């Protein structure tokens, strides 16, 4: 499916981010597993890939940013609060889907994720990435 990469884009680097999220209070296994599964570096410019797994918002073009991982994880954890491990939402609508990273994270907890984005260049980029 999606390549693991090497160095700063490897599965081991993603695991370090997951451990930092857990240290900051993200305890839902499904949320942490989504961060293990989705390579954040493919959603940002290659020049910034060495910073992809920092817990920071990063520019994605058109004056927009990819959200800080802790913010994304906190929102998804809240969505799953009091839900069983096998629970899936039927539909989730994400307004301002940007590069598609959060939509990819959400795809593990919903049957269908619909993203709305007003900036065409981001729509085009995220559509291509989500198909992978």
Model segments located where?
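Alpha-helix C-capping/helix-to-loop hinge sites
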Residues: 20-24, 60, 113
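Conserved alpha-helix/loop element of class I SAM-dependent methyltransferases that forms part
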Residues: 55, 66-89
């Amino acid at each position: 499916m999606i390549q693991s990469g090497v160095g700063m884009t490897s599965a081991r680097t993603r695991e370090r981010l997951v451990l930092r999220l857990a240290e900051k209070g993200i305890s839902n296994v499904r949320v942490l597993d989504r961060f293990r599964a989705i390579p954040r570096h493919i959603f940002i410019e290659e020049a910034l890939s060495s910073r992809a797994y920092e817990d920071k918002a990063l520019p994605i073009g058109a004056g927009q940013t990819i959200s800080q991982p802790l913010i994304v994880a906190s929102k998804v954890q809240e969505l799953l609060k009091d839900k069983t491990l096998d629970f899936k939402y039927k539909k989730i609508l994400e307004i301002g889907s940007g590069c598609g990273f959060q939509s990819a994270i959400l795809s593990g907890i919903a049957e269908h994720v619909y993203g709305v984005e007003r900036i065409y260049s981001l729509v085009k980029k995220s559509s291509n990435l989500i198909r992978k």
